[in-house]
């Protein structure tokens, strides 16, 4: 009894039950839990009610059958669920075990007697099946294989957790990801432009994105394995044959090494890309098939070996009866799918080995995988490579297993690789840690007992672990590689010894063959800049394409810790730095040193303006500094020798300035005309550009007001006052969304027109009128009777191409600096608003809602064809490397209003279903969105990235790392920022390098899409198409 009570107590939420209640509840039950295999029906509807059930581990689904005999999913239950029927003599629904489960049966009569005494305590924790069945609200289906991409946290919490595809709905830019669940990510506001949210609709709290994956990954692996089996049977290599070993003759088997050779040859002959796979990667593919029971070792071994004395055979039950050779396309897709799954398997294979058995190639694989783990993102390359030798894996099969207890001596550092754990301090659960989080480090660092008890929260939780000895060894090596520079006894610069990539500048510019140097970890802002000038600038040449990484990191991130005016002031003081003269003989050397200081400043400014281009000259401080520096160089040339090359370089900078001034001095362009993108959107949008904004009053009358995009909310109110008969009473600028939500802008908020949500209206009213504001009818978007679809006018290929051209134009206008302004906080950069990023994110939301709207407004005859066409557009967009379109459409089709349309999905061809499943797999959030990052790593520029994920990564870094420690800039955080900024710049590098200056103007038809963004309206249309009683598409029974 004590053992079972202890196990139950570890389950959430039952840990709040008293011992007396648990003992009373379980007193007549068998203390040995029942183990039920996957696929077993626990009970069916209308069977006599005999038990209540307490789920200790695993997962079950409650479902019912419709009059057509189809399955209707009701609810998924996981460990800790206590479920049954109270007032019915027969079961209200059926129950299927979807993951191997352990449960305790509690006799119905006994449970009712306990419930009559302790109903107040039990009621919040029990699941009454009859209530689920009669619930009028639509259930939130959870497919056994689904997982969340943006763990439903709202506004500010959003990036501190994993993004859950099940929660991406839309994005926006005036603060953060308003629901990174991106459901409409209305307006990304980290410090939401200080806007006040009034009467937010409760129905918007719901998560409207479902990831169901119509064909599960297991089935895709089996199908791919079947294709390889058919190919092996029908080619002439005779890989499958009878083999005589030392002791016996084995029929129809294969040799491990030959299987690798055959698969390598097959890959080379069928691959349509220039990528390659190594033998170790091919081994991982066979390991995947071995793990999934498609092949087996003749002696039952569980690891695939690339050896001539390892024998395997296809599993009898799996062998394909189809003897027709598969097509080249089928083989290519199968290998591609298996190769995308294989790295995970390969990684686990390697970390299961002792460190001394890992080959250099295997250590490289482990290192690459460690780069995808969130908890290790702040560690240097050197530390990650050291961890590759020591990291191991631990797995706990059942939820409720204790990893370690409070007070124990710490022996391991843990990183959650899969699953989740509860942190329990003094008997109270304080938090939940999920994939990518780490724990147990404090006890190792301080040599103290464990401060908490850690209990697994999910079945099959898996951890990477580093033992105490190797953990401390790495710490000591890091400390040994750390150099602290002090000034008056205080740290002013902290450096770490690191490997320097070939071609990067080193400390001694005359010794460019060194393999190591120093990277800045932290320091005073001025000392970091001085370190850049002293150690990196001398080695730079004219070609900034091979720019020193540290110099680039500083320039891309300095706005976060050192404003432009501070940088310019320090450069000016460094330019006039007086060299120290020890003797008269050193006068020549001092003159040389003086010239060197001036050269460094001019070279730094050259790199700075070359990287930022027009954004450098947008700032009046840096713009005027160039002219001032030019005058100083002219004067110094008269008295110092060796200034000719400096004059040439500053002249080049000045010429660039004159060219940029022509861009900045262009006539103001119209960006948004009454909420619609103008026919020729400026590229990029400048602060002087204009939006013709419709301003509404409380009585719903309106007028059009031309507004510069950099105007504040207060200035817009004052401009509006001139058009109104208002007295001097204070006015408020209010956004009213289509769902009725009202957001009040603070007086200093800027870039108002570009951050408005789709279908929103902007009001200027006094405070008493705010409660009277309601959405208008036209904010609901198009209706079936008024909607005219462009899908009937343009084919999929052309649509995807036009979307790519337009999105490429928006991407080209967006600079990496805008990402920094957005994440640090827009209010911190009043002169540098991310207008272009606003438009890019606005477009993501627009395409996402467009795909949902078009399907819901389509006629019954055309709906399936429209759905099929969107899948086709997303597929072609992937070929164009337009990931914005790919993921916006995928998320739009995953909206609950679409995913529940079972009858529509059932008409879709299997090939389209499979294609959509592959698109959904790209949004798999595991291992820090590993699938997406691998996809991007193989792409050549230009490509259009998944912008919401970039913003999520940056916000996670910003919220998880302080910008300053003890007065020193945390430059390791800046290194992490810069790495993302570099990848963002890289995705459009071909455009920026001048390879593609002439863009084909996209058709106006695709620039502005009419959409419905009101979640309630979308669900209403969905229920009109298929009422609630219709079976749900995402219920899959195995």
Swiss-Prot record:
Source organism, top-level taxon: Eukaryota
Tissues and organs where the protein is expressed, per its UniProt entry: Expressed specifically in neurons including the nerve ring, ventral and dorsal nerve cord motor neurons and tail ganglia.
GO MF annotations in UniProt: guanyl-nucleotide exchange factor activity
Sequence ranges assigned to domain N-terminal Ras-GEF in this UniProt record: 516-654
Location of the Ras-GEF domain: 795-1028
GO terms, biological process: Ras protein signal transduction
Record: residues binding a nucleoside 3',5'-cyclic phosphate 2: 375-492
Official protein name in the record: Rap guanine nucleotide exchange factor 1
Organism: Caenorhabditis elegans
């Amino acid at each position: 009894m004590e053992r079972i009570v202890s196990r139950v107590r570890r389950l959430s939420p039952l840990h709040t039950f008293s011992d007396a209640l648990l003992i009373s509840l379980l007193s007549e039950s068998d203390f040995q839990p029942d183990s039920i295999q996957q696929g077993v029906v626990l009970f069916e509807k209308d069977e006599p009610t005999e038990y209540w059930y307490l789920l200790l581990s695993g997962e079950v689904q409650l479902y019912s059958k419709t009059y057509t005999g189809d399955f209707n999913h009701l609810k998924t239950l996981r460990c800790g669920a206590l479920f049954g029927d109270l007032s019915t003599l027969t079961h209200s629904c059926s129950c299927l075990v979807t993951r191997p489960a352990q449960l305790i049966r509690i006799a119905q009569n006994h449970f009712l007697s306990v419930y009559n005494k302790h109903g107040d305590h039990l009621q919040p924790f029990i699941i009454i099946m009859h209530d689920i069945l009669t619930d009028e609200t639509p259930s939130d289906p959870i497919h056994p294989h689904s997982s969340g991409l943006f763990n439903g946290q709202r506004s500010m919490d959003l990036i501190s957790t994993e993004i859950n595809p099940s929660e991406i709905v839309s994005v926006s830019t005036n603060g953060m990801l308003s629901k990174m669940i991106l459901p409409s990510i209305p307006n990304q506001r980290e410090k939401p432009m200080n806007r006040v949210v009034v009467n937010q609709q409760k129905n918007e709290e719901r998560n409207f994105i479902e990831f169901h994956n119509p064909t599960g990954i297991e089935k895709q692996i089996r199908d791919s394995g079947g294709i390889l089996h058919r190919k092996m049977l029908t080619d002439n290599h005779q890989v499958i044959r009878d083999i005589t070993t030392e002791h016996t003759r084995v029929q129809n088997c294969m040799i491990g090494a030959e299987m690798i050779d055959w698969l390598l040859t097959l890959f080379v002959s069928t691959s349509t890309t220039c990528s390659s796979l190594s033998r170790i990667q091919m081994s991982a593919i066979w390991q995947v098939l071995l793990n999934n029971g498609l092949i087996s070792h003749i002696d039952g071994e569980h690891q695939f070996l690339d050896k001539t004395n390892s024998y395997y055979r296809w599993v009898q039950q799996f062998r394909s009866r189809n003897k027709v050779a598969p097509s080249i396309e089928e083989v290519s897709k199968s290998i591609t799918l298996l190769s995308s799954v294989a790295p995970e398997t390969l990684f686990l294979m390697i970390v299961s080995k002792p460190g001394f058995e890992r080959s250099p190639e295997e250590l490289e694989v482990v290192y690459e995988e460690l780069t995808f783990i969130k908890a290790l993102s702040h560690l240097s390359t050197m530390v990650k490579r050291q961890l590759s030798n020591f990291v191991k894996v631990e797995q706990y099969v059942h939820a409720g297993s204790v990893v370690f207890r409070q007070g124990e001596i710490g022996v391991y550092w843990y990183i959650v690789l899969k699953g989740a754990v509860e942190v329990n301090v003094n008997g109270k659960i304080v938090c939940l840690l999920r994939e990518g989080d780490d724990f147990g480090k404090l006890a190792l660092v301080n040599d103290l007992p464990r401060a908490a008890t850690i209990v697994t929260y999910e079945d099959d939780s898996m951890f990477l672990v580093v033992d105490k000895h190797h953990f401390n060894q790495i710490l000591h090596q890091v400390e040994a590689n750390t150099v602290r520079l002090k000034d008056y006894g205080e740290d002013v610069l902290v450096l770490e010894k690191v490997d320097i990539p070939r071609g990067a500048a080193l400390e001694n510019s005359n010794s460019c063959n060194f393999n190591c140097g120093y990277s800045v970890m932290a320091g005073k802002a001025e000392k970091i800049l001085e370190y850049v000038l002293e150690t990196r600038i001398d080695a730079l040449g004219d070609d900034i394409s091979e720019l020193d990484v540290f110099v680039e990191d500083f320039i891309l991130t300095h706005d976060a810790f050192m404003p432009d005016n501070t940088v310019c002031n320090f450069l000016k003081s460094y330019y006039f730095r007086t060299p120290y003269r020890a003797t008269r003989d050193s006068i020549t050397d001092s003159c040389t040193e003086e010239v060197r200081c001036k050269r460094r400043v001019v070279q730094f400014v050259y790199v700075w303006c070359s990287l930022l281009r027009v954004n450098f000259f947008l700032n009046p401080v840096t713009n005027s500094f160039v002219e001032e520096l030019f005058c100083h160089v002219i004067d110094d040339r008269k008295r110092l020798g060796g200034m000719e090359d400096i004059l040439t370089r500053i002249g080049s900078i000045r010429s660039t300035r004159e060219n940029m001034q022509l861009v900045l001095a262009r006539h103001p362009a119209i960006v948004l005309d009454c909420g619609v993108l103008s026919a020729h959107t400026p590229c990029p949008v400048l602060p002087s550009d204009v939006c013709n904004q419709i301003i509404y009053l409380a009585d719903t009358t309106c007028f059009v007001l031309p507004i510069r995009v950099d105007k504040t909310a207060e200035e817009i109110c004052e401009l509006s006052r001139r058009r109104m008969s208002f007295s001097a009473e204070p006015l408020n600028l209010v956004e009213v969304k289509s769902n009725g939500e009202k957001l009040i802008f603070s007086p200093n908020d800027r870039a108002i027109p570009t951050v408005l949500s789709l279908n929103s209206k902007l009001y200027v009213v006094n405070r008493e009128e705010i409660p009277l504001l309601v959405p208008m009818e036209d904010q609901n978007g198009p209706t079936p009777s008024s909607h005219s679809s462009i899908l009937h006018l343009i084919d999929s290929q052309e649509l995807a191409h036009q979307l790519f051209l337009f999105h490429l134009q928006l991407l080209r206008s967006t600079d990496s600096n805008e990402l920094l302004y957005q994440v640090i906080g827009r209010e911190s950069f009043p002169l540098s608003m991310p207008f272009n990023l606003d438009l890019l994110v606005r477009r993501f939301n627009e395409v996402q809602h467009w795909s949902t709207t078009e399907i819901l407004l389509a006629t019954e005859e055309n709906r399936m064809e429209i759905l099929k066409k969107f899948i086709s557009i997303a597929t072609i967009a992937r070929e164009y490397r337009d990931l914005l379109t790919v993921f916006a459409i995928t998320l739009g089709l995953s909206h609950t209003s679409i995913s529940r349309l079972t009858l529509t999905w059932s008409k879709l061809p299997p090939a389209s279903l499979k294609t959509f499943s592959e698109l959904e797999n790209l949004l798999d959030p595991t291992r820090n969105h590993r699938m997406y990052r691998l996809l991007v790593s193989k792409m050549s520029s230009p490509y259009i990235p998944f912008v919401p994920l970039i913003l999520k990564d940056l916000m996670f870094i910003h919220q998880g790392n302080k910008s300053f420690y003890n007065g020193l800039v945390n430059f390791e955080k800046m290194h992490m920022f810069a790495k993302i900024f570099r990848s963002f710049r890289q995705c459009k590098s071909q455009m920026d390098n001048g390879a593609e200056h002439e863009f084909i103007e996209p058709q106006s038809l695709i620039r502005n899409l009419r959409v419905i963004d009101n979640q309630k309206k979308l669900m209403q249309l969905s229920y009109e198409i298929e009422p609630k009683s219709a079976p749900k598409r995402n219920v899959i029974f195995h």
